[in-house]
């Protein structure tokens, strides 16, 4: 009978690491599997280890090559012998988490996926384990269908290692059999390097369903002797280079046969990426001529110096976060692998199997306020307060014979406290039960533990302290897909509680088992762990997501923005219900696994998804609600979002728009570059062009001013500039030099006819796109661009800004008579490049307009984007928009969503974003290393490094805050980085920003000096 899963393990020279690999297979939770061990003529005696495992366990089968044929061929040999419905590959020096294959196969079966991808955890030789957050986020969606599978794979151009490796996947064998004939040419060759790409290109091309399973996967063990660690071995290095060239040639030919030209273009990007990466490594193993020869063979049209648009070498690998093993230990305990083998598994229900989208359970009561006011016929009492006080009274009034309260007890106490009617109590009891069912969601990690225990043949029981009745809880469990438990122990039915051990004792008595035969798993350290252990049970903690989110020893996410309004308002005022609900959503999303990677010195653990979802997403939601409210109040019928700042916000507005919002939206280009004809219409405005003159050279300046420059060869322009004393490629060192150059340009090189033609084209375009009654959205700030638009359209066009600069905007608003409405009443401390990078589209900028067939159309710059910046921007913005979608889907029609019409709530919702701008911890700032922010006008063609920019601005903001008397804040939250600062500056920094640390270090220093004396 065929197995469900076949796992192929090629073996060559890995005898030392082989036992860990094979043990991880032997102990897999999926028992219906076969393990095909391919001995590729391993020279180190590994065959004896394979034979021993095959002798002890019939699921292991050994296949032998008489001579070494390479990794690609060994995998093909194993795959040809496979019988399973699904297929997986595992390298013999790696190992797999205990429940990966069962969970991945289950996901594929439930959703008809062809491919399921798990996590990758890197293990160093010293045993330390870590994840690479960028790789973990490389797939934006956890489910892809149809051509979206192919598109997602090729668009990332092999930059994300985890996407194209074959050994962290489970593959439907029907898909493999379709792909296998294409592999035949390579199977005859000896290939050991990047063979994953050859397999994956074909698999992803034909796959129609892709799923992402999180929380389980493969441990990739780093070894200096591995196939990728060849820098110190020239012969091995040359062989690897040759393999890579063959793999890319194979992949390109396959795509050519399929007519997949767009995929081929992306593959060429990947080829350049690998050429650059290996050329860097080659410096250690080869001389320069040989590097050139090898690189030319791999990618003939590649230039190491010329391809500046390629991402920084290893950027995708750089941010690293420690992996935490808590959930893996729970899974192993359920399976009885680490000395404890309990036949009964007990699981808590609320916050272990079921989640609500709230930071605290009481927040659910706040969502019922509107229904309370209708049921109670309007009163001054808050339902959340009344409900909380009623439960406290009910517990105080319980008779000694009753252990726990019920809903009847609670609402009876409310009747006594407030004198509300039976009808009101009946309505609110019903409303609360229905709200619990409506808001509940499965906790994926908890459900996986439940299913794992069932698959392992354990008796699975549910144990809960809860006032809700059993029928309501069963409805919640069924909604969350949880069925088939073997016992349900509910405190108000059993008349016993967990905290004193009584409910645990009833459980063991009714099941007829000894306490040490039960493993209990729950989210509360005292009730689910300490109390269970006191009752004689084994117990393990699965931390509640919201508790992890709020724990500063795990993450600084909840602390973001706390210092932004310090001294102006209270902490409670900065935590309205909407923000608490946002925190609940974020906690459930990122800490569903209570041991998900997180560190105390970071907010996002360097995950772009966390930065996007929580920090950018909350601000995006607030901005969108503000815009809709303002447009409704101002009677705006057409709102035009200006590129590139408005692209993301427009999508959020469209998500939230209701029938009450009649505003029509559009999106048009309006860059500094394309508006230069209007910005320079008046000669007096030339001196205040929005440029950083210090980064410009005459060459760059004339490219910028090409729309109004005389027709002449570049050589002639250069000759005239240098003859006038302006060296062609020398930056302007002083503002006076820049001003002198502009005067020279106006006198010698300016063409008024060209300028007028460019102005007329821009005017025709904007008159059509901004008809009467239109308003604009732009990020801000000075009003120059809006003034230019008003000048071109010859009418006052209102504008909505995130914020204005407070000086020029007022002056220009008055001069050109356009109203300015700002989300923030004053400029925030951190603005500019980082804000725009997070919120703006990274599409190619508009550089001007041209006439085509009696129409004016925008002209865009060539797409020379940095792939790393593109990935980071897309990932952050995708998850920000997902937050808006989740918040709307969860809270639409409730008071939570309605509260976002309040400007104070909008401001509070933006504090995490402002905190991320100003207080980004250094561990998260690693995401910005070598990420350029490009502004063709402001910065010329120079790219601003975001990490450096953010560090400088946050330090300036911290100093300014201190000068204004702001309270102390933890040094790691304000951009002061002690590890990267000299002794004197470090001392001053601690004194200014972290006085407690300063005092501790001072005492330590004085004590050491005293001992030395």
Over which residues does each language-model region extend?
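Glycine-rich, basic loop-to-helix element that forms the pyrophosphate-binding segment
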Residues: 65-82, 89
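Conserved donor NDP-sugar-binding/catalytic core segment of glycosyltransferases
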Residues: 99-135
């Amino acid at each position: 009978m065929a197995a469900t899963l076949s796992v192929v393990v090629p073996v060559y020279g890995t005898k030392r690491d082989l036992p860990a690999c094979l043990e991880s297979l032997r102990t897999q939770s999926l028992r219906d599997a076969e393990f095909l061990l391919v001995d590729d003529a391993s020279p180190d005696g590994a065959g004896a280890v394979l034979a021993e495992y095959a002798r002890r366990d019939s699921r292991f089968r050994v296949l032998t090559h008489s001579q070494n044929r390479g990794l690609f061929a060994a995998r093909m040999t194993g795959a040809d012998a496979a019988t399973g419905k699904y297929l997986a590959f595992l390298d013999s020096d790696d190992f797999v988490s205990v429940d990966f294959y069962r969970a991945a196969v289950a996901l594929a079966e439930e959703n008809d996926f062809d491919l399921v991808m798990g996590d990758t955890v890197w293990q160093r030789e010293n045993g330390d384990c870590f994840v690479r957050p960028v790789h973990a986020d490389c797939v934006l969606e956890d489910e892809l269908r149809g051509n979206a599978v192919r598109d997602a794979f090729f668009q990332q151009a092999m930059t994300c290692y985890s996407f194209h490796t074959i050994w962290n996947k489970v593959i439907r064998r029907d898909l493999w059999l379709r792909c296998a004939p294409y592999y035949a040419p390579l199977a005859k060759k000896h290939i050991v390097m990047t063979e994953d790409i050859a397999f994956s290109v074909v698999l992803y091309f034909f796959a129609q369903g892709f799923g992402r399973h999180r929380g389980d996967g493969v441990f990739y063990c780093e070894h200096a002797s591995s196939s990728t660690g060849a820098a110190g071995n020239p012969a091995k290095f040359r062989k690897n280079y040759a393999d890579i060239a063959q793999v890319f040639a194979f992949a390109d030919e396959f795509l050519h046969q399929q007519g997949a030209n767009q995929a081929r273009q992306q593959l060429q990007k990947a080829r350049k990426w690998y050429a650059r990466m290996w050329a860097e490594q080659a410096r250690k193993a080869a001389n320069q001529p040989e590097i050139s020869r090898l690189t030319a063979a791999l990618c003939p049209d590649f230039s190491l110096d010329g391809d500046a648009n390629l991402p920084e070498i290893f950027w995708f690998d750089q941010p690293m976060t420690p992996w935490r093993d808590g959930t893996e230990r729970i899974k192993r305990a359920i399976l009885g692998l680490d000395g404890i083998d309990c036949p009964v598994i007990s699981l808590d229900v609320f916050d272990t199997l079921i989640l609500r989208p709230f930071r605290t359970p009481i927040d659910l009561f706040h969502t019922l306020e509107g229904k309370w006011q209708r049921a109670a016929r309007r009163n001054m009492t808050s339902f959340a307060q009344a409900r909380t006080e009623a439960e406290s009274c009910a517990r105080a009034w319980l008779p000694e014979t009753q252990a726990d309260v019920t809903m009847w007890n609670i609402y009876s106490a409310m009747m006594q406290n407030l004198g509300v009617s039976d009808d009101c109590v009946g309505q609110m009891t019903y409303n609360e039960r229905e709200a619990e069912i409506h808001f509940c969601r499965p906790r994926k990690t908890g459900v996986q533990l439940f299913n794992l225990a069932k698959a392992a043949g354990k008796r699975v029981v549910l144990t809960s302290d809860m006032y809700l009745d059993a029928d309501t809880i069963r409805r919640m469990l069924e909604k969350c897909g949880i069925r088939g438990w073997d016992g349900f122990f509910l405190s108000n039915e059993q008349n016993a509680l967990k905290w004193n051990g009584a409910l645990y004792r009833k459980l063991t008595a009714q099941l007829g088992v000894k306490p040490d035969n039960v493993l209990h798993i729950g989210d509360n350290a005292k009730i689910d762990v300490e109390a269970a252990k006191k009752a004689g049970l084994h117990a393990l903690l699965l931390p509640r997501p919201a508790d992890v989110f709020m724990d500063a020893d795990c993450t600084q996410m909840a602390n973001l923005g706390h210092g932004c309004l310090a001294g102006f308002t209270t902490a409670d005022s900065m935590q309205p219900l909407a923000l608490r609900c946002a925190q609940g959503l974020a906690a459930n999303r990122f800490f569903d696994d209570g041991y998900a990677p997180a560190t105390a010195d970071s907010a996002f653990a360097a995950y772009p998804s966390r930065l996007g979802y929580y920090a950018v997403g909350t601000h995006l939601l607030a901005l969108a609600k503000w815009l809709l409210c303002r447009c409704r109040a101002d009677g705006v019928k057409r709102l035009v979002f200006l590129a590139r700042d408005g692209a993301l916000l427009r999508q959020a507005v469209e998500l939230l728009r209701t029938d009450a919002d009649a505003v029509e939206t559009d999106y048009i280009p309006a860059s500094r570059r394309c508006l230069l004809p209007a910005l320079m219409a008046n000669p007096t405005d030339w001196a205040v062009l929005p440029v950083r003159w210090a980064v410009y050279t005459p060459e760059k300046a004339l490219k910028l001013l090409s729309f109004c420059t005389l027709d002449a060869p570049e050589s002639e322009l250069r000759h005239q500039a240098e003859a006038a004393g302006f060296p062609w490629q020398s930056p302007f060192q002083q503002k006076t030099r820049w001003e002198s150059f502009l005067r020279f340009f106006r006198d010698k090189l300016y063409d008024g006819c060209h300028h007028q033609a460019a102005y007329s084209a821009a005017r025709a375009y904007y008159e059509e796109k901004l008809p009467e009654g239109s308003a604009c959205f732009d990020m801000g700030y000075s009003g120059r661009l809006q003034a230019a638009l008003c000048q071109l359209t010859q009418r006052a066009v209102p504008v909505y800004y995130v914020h204005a600069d407070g000086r020029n905007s007022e002056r220009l608003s008055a001069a050109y008579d356009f109203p300015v409405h700002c989300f923030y009443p004053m400029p925030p401390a951190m603005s500019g490049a980082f804000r725009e990078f997070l919120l703006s589209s990274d599409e190619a900028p508009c550089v001007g307009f041209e006439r085509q067939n009696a129409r004016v159309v925008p002209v865009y710059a060539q797409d020379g984007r940095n792939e790393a910046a593109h990935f980071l921007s897309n990932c952050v913005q995708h998850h920000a928009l997902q937050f808006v979608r989740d918040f709307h889907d969860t809270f639409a029609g409730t008071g939570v969503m309605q509260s976002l019409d309040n400007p104070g709530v909008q401001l509070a919702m933006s504090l995490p974003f402002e905190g991320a701008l100003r207080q980004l911890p250094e561990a998260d700032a690693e995401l910005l290393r070598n990420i350029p922010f490009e502004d063709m006008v402001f910065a010329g063609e120079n790219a601003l490094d975001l990490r450096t920019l953010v560090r400088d601005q946050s330090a300036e903001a911290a100093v300014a805050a201190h000068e204004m008397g702001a309270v102390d804040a933890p040094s790691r939250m304000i951009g002061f980085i002690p590890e990267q600062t000299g002794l004197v500056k470090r001392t001053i920094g601690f004194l200014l920003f972290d006085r407690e640390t300063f005092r501790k270090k001072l005492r330590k220093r004085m004590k050491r000096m005293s001992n030395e004396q």
